[in-house]
Amino acid sequence: MIVAVFVGLSFAHLLRSDRRPAFFDVLFALAALAGALGFAFGLFEELVPYDELTHAFTTFCVSLTFYFLFYGGAVPERRAVALGTSVFTLGDTVGAYWEIFEWFFVAHYTMADTISDLLVDSGGALAAALVALALRRSGDRLT
């Protein structure tokens, strides 16, 4: 499922290829690779921080994808709060829906695991919102 989500986001991302820096492509590919490797080799269960790091990094990349797809530098100076809030909210929402999907279709993890995943998803979304604000201020360069 995670691969399908990244394929869909990648396709949408390619349609707007003029709206994102090349360095972001590497981050996006690393997030997809981290998720795929985690599922293929059982790294989520084997390595203790792998699940948390992957959740935070993936949410960070997905949230930045929203920024590049929907805003792409078209945000006026006085709309910084709206930009940061929407990038954070979209990323956090994706994390919450992922946890719902995981609960119903993958496995019934403990409540502690679900809560910790939601917290690190929020951290990744917050980091993406801060990066989006910095990119808007600097002119969308991520090099």
Regions inferred by a protein language model and the residue ranges of each:
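"…centered on the first transmembrane helix and the immediately adjacent amphipathic helix/loop
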Residues: M1-F60, L64
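Structural signature of transmembrane alpha-helix termini at the membrane-water interface
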Residues: F11-L15, L37-F44, L69-G73, A96, ...
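Residue-level signature of transmembrane alpha-helical entry/exit and packing/kink sites
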Residues: F24, E52, R79-V87, D117, ...
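Small-polar-interrupted transmembrane alpha-helices in polytopic inner-membrane proteins
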Residues: D25-F39, L83-F104, D113
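Interfacial helix-loop-helix junctions of multi-pass membrane proteins
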Residues: G42-D51, G95-L126
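Short, conserved structural micro-motifs that define repeat-unit consensus positions
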Residues: D51-F68, G91-E102
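Membrane-interfacial alpha-helical segments at the cytosolic side of multi-pass membrane proteins
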Residues: F57-A74, A107-T110, G123-R137
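Internal alpha-helical transmembrane segments of multi-pass membrane proteins
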Residues: Y71-G91, T143
